[in-house]
Design a protein with these regions (language model features):
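Alpha/beta-hydrolase fold catalytic core
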Residues: 1-35, 56-59, 92-99, 123, ...
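Active-site loop/oxyanion-hole signature of alpha/beta-hydrolase fold enzymes
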Residues: 16-19, 61, 65-103, 117, ...
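Conserved HGGG/HGGXW glycine-rich cap/lid loop of the alpha/beta-hydrolase fold
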Residues: 27-70
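Gly/Ala-rich beta-loop-alpha elbow adjacent to hydrolase catalytic centers
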Residues: 104, 108, 112
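Flexible "cap/lid" loop of the alpha/beta hydrolase fold
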Residues: 117, 124-160
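Conserved alpha/beta-hydrolase catalytic His-Asp/Glu region
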Residues: 142, 163-226
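Conserved serine/cysteine hydrolase catalytic core
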Residues: 200-253, 262
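Catalytic histidine-centered segment of alpha/beta-hydrolase-like enzymes
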Residues: 266-279
Length: 288
């Protein structure tokens, strides 16, 4: 059963049918350009609930990627960030056909770099004006992947997915938060409920395939960070044990002129830990 906070978030959105399956979408009309919020692995758009409350009269939209949160979780299925980018394009076309600015976290940063690559190639079907990447292992060789991530992407991934339970998930998820802002019981329950909806924990090994795509498409996605001709900033929580400051250093090497805002000592989920500071940083970088 979904906790009340999740059901409230769900009640404010709707399901949108795409070529790949139905995805949960939540949006708010307002002044533009609309803010497009992309979440990470293994969570959902629920991560941004406190951020959206701090966007004032700004239009925004977000979604749960296919396989995540309140969206369909097909199996068997070959999950791909290229498909997720297609889904994002379909959602934008349906919800906010005007110009957008982009804020992406974790796995969502690689979906974002695919969108940047398409924009460079002239194949992106919407106008993307600015983008901000936050705590995502875009340069995977510089990241400190968790042991569970390494197992999930390997031959024993299906076994680990079958064995995943709430206790183990919460223990690992808590390690992503800083000591100053530890994972709360309510947050843990909500995150597990969203992931485990429709037995989503059983497909974690399928969802984790995005890590291999970060290797396969490194030249394309790193090149997009380097070459995209519009403003791109980095908003980084420096206490992240996975997407560490080593990743940020690599991004700075790719794009030395990028504006960077650091959130000292904060963990992997700054939008949950410090929504005020996170939203303020995002608004500054996106100039909204």
């Amino acid at each position: 059963m979904l906790p009340d906070s999740v059901r409230q978030w769900q009640a404010g959105g709707r399901m949108l049918s795409t070529a790949a399956g139905s995805v949960f979408v939540r949006s708010k009309p307002g002044t533009g350009p609309a803010v497009l919020l992309l979440h990470g692995f293994p969570s959902s758009s629920y991560d941004y609930r406190d951020v959206t409350q701090r966007l004032g009269d700004r239009a925004w939209l977000t979604l749960d990627f296919l396989g995540f949160g309140l969206s369909d979780k097909p199996r068997p299925h070959r999950y791909s960030l290229l498909e997720q980018a297609d889904i994002v394009a379909a959602v934008v076309a349906d919800v906010a056909p005007g110009p957008v600015v982009l804020l992406a976290h974790d796995m969502g940063t690689s979906v974002a770099t695919e969108l940047l690559a398409r924009d460079i190639a002239g194949t992106l079907p919407f106008e993307l004006q600015r983008a901000v990447l936050t705590n995502g292992s875009v340069i995977i060789e510089r990241a400190s992947l968790r042991r569970s991530q390494k197992i999930l992407r390997g031959p024993f991934g299906p076994i680990l997915a079958r064995l995943t339970n709430e206790r183990g998930f919460v223990r690992g998820f808590a390690e992503l938060f800083s000591a100053q802002h530890p994972l709360t019981d309510d947050e843990a329950r909500a995150q597990w409920a969203l992931m485990a909806r429709d037995d989503g924990q059983r497909i974690l090994h399928l969802l984790c395939a995005y890590l291999n795509e970060r290797v396969r498409f490194a030249a394309r996605w790193h090149g997009a960070v380097r070459d995209w001709g519009k403003p791109l900033g980095f908003l980084w929580a420096t206490g992240d044990p996975v997407a560490t400051t080593n990743v940020l250093a690599g991004l700075r090497e790719l794009r030395p002129a990028a504006e960077v805002i650091e959130l000292p000592g904060i963990g992997h989920y700054p939008q949950i830990e410090v929504p005020d500071e996170f939203t303020a940083g995002a608004r500054r970088l996106l100039q909204i």
